[in-house]
């Protein structure tokens, strides 16, 4: 214990954030030096009295015999103590704040996954809400840092903690809280370094959540911009993160450009192939029934990942392809009845009403995916002689 305390004092006195983050790690797998001993005894050995409550809270958080709820409370108390001392510290303290907030969220996430009892799970959720307020306090300390030197300012931790809060809020299913945090940061962006100057690991997470939130708000164009940015910022070896980004970007990219992933993408990310390939193949064939079956098989995933709305929007493209096949089968006739479309839908095993088909055609016309108009008296779609299906004609 004496060696451990001596190392703690050295890291605190020399303001060595990375070393202190290692010494105050609350994961025994990454910090075998953390002593399972009396918290007060360890804290009493810290020469800087301001740090004594931090060290005491750290030792208490390392207690493996506590329940998941108690562990979460202890880790929250540890971060709260770090926030207290961070008020008068500069950029050097960020590594330990990063580590503490990440582990706090990890404790909560694992508890939610492992606990089956509904009442116990609700207690964890309530505690996580409290934890999110502590992390929000950490973000506020970064945003409001008035250090005269920007290089030594805690502002460099801003986007990391925005990402941490978004992860917590999504875990709690409170996406509006994520939007509120992002609005606050955007309103203060003039006082922050440019986004591009932050570590890519921070901006990648930020861009990803901006993209997901845009998609949930049905702003597909903004979703494409942010998710593409996140993919470009993602570390090339972080294939799991790339896969998560692409899980959202693939439907967005199709909605915006009609593009589907290349063979190389499918080979690199076989799980994405499992999720999307059957669905996209059916879409490109105009096979409504197979498309619906593929979506139904993955419905729980799409709902969980906030993708269901985007996938439902893709269904319009299946009918567009089906209508195009009818157009070609009729030698590119400029007049096609709604009954013809309904008969084609029945051929692929889908029973839809004439009203639904008219609404689908109207939607295609509105979005410039079909050139023409509907003659409602004759229940006929009148197509332009040239370029009736501009997107599909171009692709062909």
Curated annotation (Swiss-Prot):
Q: Which GO terms describe its molecular function?
A: double-stranded DNA binding; RNA binding
SMART domains linked to this entry: PAM
**Pfam families reported in the protein's UniProt record:** PCI
Name the PROSITE patterns for this protein: PCI
Q: Where does the PCI domain start and stop, copy by copy?
A: 204-388
Q: Which domain of life is it from?
A: Eukaryota
InterPro entries linked to this entry: Csn12-like, PCI_dom, WH-like_DNA-bd_sf
Family named by the database record:
Belongs to the CSN12 family.
Protein name (record): Protein CSN12 homolog
Lineage, top ranks: Eukaryota, Fungi, Dikarya, Ascomycota, Saccharomycotina
């Amino acid at each position: 214990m004496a060696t451990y305390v001596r190392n703690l004092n050295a890291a605190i006195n020399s303001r060595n954030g990375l070393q202190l983050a290692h010494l105050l790690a609350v994961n025994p797998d990454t910090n075998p030096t953390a002593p399972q001993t009396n918290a007060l005894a360890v804290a009493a050995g810290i020469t800087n009295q301001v740090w004594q409550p931090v060290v005491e809270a750290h030792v208490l958080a390392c207690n493996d015999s506590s329940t998941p709820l108690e562990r979460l409370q202890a880790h929250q108390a540890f971060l709260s103590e770090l926030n207290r001392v961070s008020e008068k510290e500069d950029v050097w303290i960020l590594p330990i704040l990063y580590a503490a907030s990440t582990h706090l969220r990890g404790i909560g996430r694992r508890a939610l996954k492992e606990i089956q009892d509904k009442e116990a799970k609700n207690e964890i959720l309530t505690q996580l809400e409290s934890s999110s307020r502590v992390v929000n306090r950490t973000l506020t300390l970064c945003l409001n840092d008035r250090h005269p030197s920007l290089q030594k300012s805690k502002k460099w931790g801003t986007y990391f903690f925005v990402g941490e809060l978004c992860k917590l809020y999504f875990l709690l299913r409170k996406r509006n809280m994520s939007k509120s945090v992002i609005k606050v940061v955007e309103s203060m962006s003039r006082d922050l370094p440019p986004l591009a100057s932050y570590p890519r690991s921070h901006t990648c997470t930020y861009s990803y959540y901006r993209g997901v939130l845009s998609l949930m708000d049905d702003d597909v164009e903004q979703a494409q911009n942010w998710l593409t940015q996140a993919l470009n910022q993602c570390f090339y070896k972080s294939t799991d993160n790339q896969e998560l980004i692409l899980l959202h970007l693939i439907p967005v990219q199709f909605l915006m450009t009609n593009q589907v992933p290349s063979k190389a993408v499918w080979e690199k990310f076989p799980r994405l192939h499992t999720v999307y390939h059957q669905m996209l193949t059916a879409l490109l064939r105009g096979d409504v029934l197979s498309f619906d079956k593929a979506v139904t098989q993955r419905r729980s995933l799409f709902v969980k990942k906030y993708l269901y709305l985007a996938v439902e929007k893709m269904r319009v493209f299946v009918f567009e392809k089906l209508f195009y096949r009818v157009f070609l089968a009729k030698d590119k006739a400029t007049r096609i009845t709604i009954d013809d479309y309904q008969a084609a839908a029945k051929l692929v095993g889908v029973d839809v009403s004439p009203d639904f088909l008219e609404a689908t055609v109207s939607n295609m016309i509105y979005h410039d995916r079909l050139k023409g108009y509907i003659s409602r008296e004759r229940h006929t779609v009148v197509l332009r002689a040239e370029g009736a299906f501009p997107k599909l004609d171009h692709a062909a």
